[in-house]
Amino acid sequence: LHGRRFSNGRILDLGNKGPTLRRSDRLLQLAQGLRILHVGCCDHLPLIHEKRQQGLYLHENLCRVATQCVGVDTNAEGVALLRSTGFPQTYTPDDAPLTSVVDGKEQAYDLCLLADVIEHVGNPVEFLSGMRRYQFKRLVVVTPNAFRWRNSWPGGEAINTDHRFWFTPYTLCKVLVD
């Protein structure tokens, strides 16, 4: 990952052996009972209401299982919508608390979650460097996998038109260590 040895044909074992949890279920499991900072909490604005009705809205589900759930998003309209619908600890990046505050005491967040964010950012390394302003004990970054079966339609590319990048497990790790 640090570029000490070069290979133009290395095969990375992805560990895809046996049954696994759905990604959303695993994220809820990781957040259980923790103080979390959820970066990119708004999702795509047109999808929030629909996902909430279906019980699939990640930020809402995280807030149900976490001890504290602070949401951060660059979408000011989405932040306003969430605040008006029962999520008062939702902020734009400039207003977000850098630490978790519990009983008047500042503490590092237990978990900082970047779920489906990194693929939207023009400069992922710079963005991740900027995340250092927040205090957290653990960082979890998830993104759509470039290798997932839905992306391999014959003769076409299934895309989210807001994405700037596709990551593989290895290339995401390379960006994270930069």
Language model regions located:
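A conserved beta-strand element that flanks and buttresses the S-adenosyl-L-methionine
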Residues: 113
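Short amphipathic alpha-helix with an adjacent loop that forms part of the alpha/beta core around
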Residues: 28, 96-108
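A short His-aromatic
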Residues: 116-120
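Class I SAM-dependent methyltransferase SAM/SAH-binding core
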Residues: 41-100
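Conserved alpha-helix/loop element of class I SAM-dependent methyltransferases that forms part
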Residues: 16-35, 45, 52-60
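Residues at the starts of beta-strands that form the adenosine-phosphate
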Residues: 35, 67-68, 138
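S-adenosyl-L-methionine-dependent methyltransferase catalytic module, highlighting the catalytic core
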Residues: 2-15, 20-21, 81, 122-178
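Local beta-strand N-terminus motif with an aromatic residue
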Residues: 33, 108-109, 136
